[in-house]
Amino acid sequence: MKKLLYITVNSKPENLSASKTVGRAFVNRFLEKHSDFEIEELDLYKCHIPRLEYEYFEKRSCLVNEDAFNKLDKKQQEEVHKIVKLTDQFKEADVYVIAAPMWSMSFPAPLKEYIDCIVMDGKTVDIKDGEKPEGLLNDKPRGAVYIQSSGAKMNVLLKMVMDKGVHYIESIMKFMGIEKFEELLVDGTGTTEEEKNKAIEKAIENIDSVIDGIW
């Protein structure tokens, strides 16, 4: 079966998180429309993400060779194994759904830490000295969706200035070779439950068109 990797980046439980509420509605609808998929879930607030240390790398975005690995202590070796596991999990998927709130014009830090782990030479990208890096995830059909919640309602101009997260995620996906990308915004969650529910309902109405855009 094909695999949908559902990545959440919010410490709130699903019933309190607008992005995770819409994310759940999205993946459920996707699986209804595409029965040949199975889902794998990754909560970046519950999953350990290694901090990248220089000892783990032979060169930029390239993990150490076997000899250097054997010189690491047990904890360091476990961290390298975790990086490999996260990268392999990402590479094996066909569709990626990331649900996160907009924080500080971007997204919560665990998502950046995760991305730093999976952008790996020889697995998701090909990096050669003196040459432009090339994404390796164009080897089969793939698609990605970024679901983002934000308290404010943003017009086009404000979005260009304030919303860096969507643009970064789209850029990093395409950098790895994933060309099909869609955003699903949960804008205007505001400060009241009514505002939040309206924003969620509006986003859910767009789910089918977003699914059709990636698969």
From Swiss-Prot:
Function: Quinone reductase that provides resistance to thiol-specific stress caused by electrophilic quinones. Also exhibits azoreductase activity. Catalyzes the reductive cleavage of the azo bond in aromatic azo compounds to the corresponding amines.
EC number(s) on file: 1.6.5.-, 1.7.1.17
Protein family (similarity comment): Belongs to the azoreductase type 1 family.
Oligomeric and partner information: Homodimer.
Source species of the chain: Clostridium botulinum (strain Alaska E43 / Type E3)
Entries under Pfam families matching the protein: Flavodoxin_2
UniProt-listed Gene3D superfamilies: 3.40.50.360
Protein name, as recorded: FMN-dependent NADH:quinone oxidoreductase
Entry's cofactor comment: Binds 1 FMN per subunit.
Binding site for FMN: S17, A18, S19
InterPro entries for the chain: Flavodoxin_fold, Flavoprotein-like_sf, FMN-dep_NADH:Q_OxRdtase_AzoR1, NADH:quinone_OxRdtase_FMN_depd
Record keywords: Flavoprotein, FMN, NAD, Oxidoreductase
Cofactor needs: FMN
Designated gene of the protein: azoR
Entry's Gene Ontology molecular function annotations: electron transfer activity; FMN binding; oxidoreductase activity, acting on NAD(P)H as acceptor; oxidoreductase activity, acting on NAD(P)H, quinone or similar compound as acceptor
Catalysed conversion reaction: 2 a quinone + NADH + H(+) = 2 a 1,4-benzosemiquinone + NAD(+); N,N-dimethyl-1,4-phenylenediamine + anthranilate + 2 NAD(+) = 2-(4-dimethylaminophenyl)diazenylbenzoate + 2 NADH + 2 H(+)
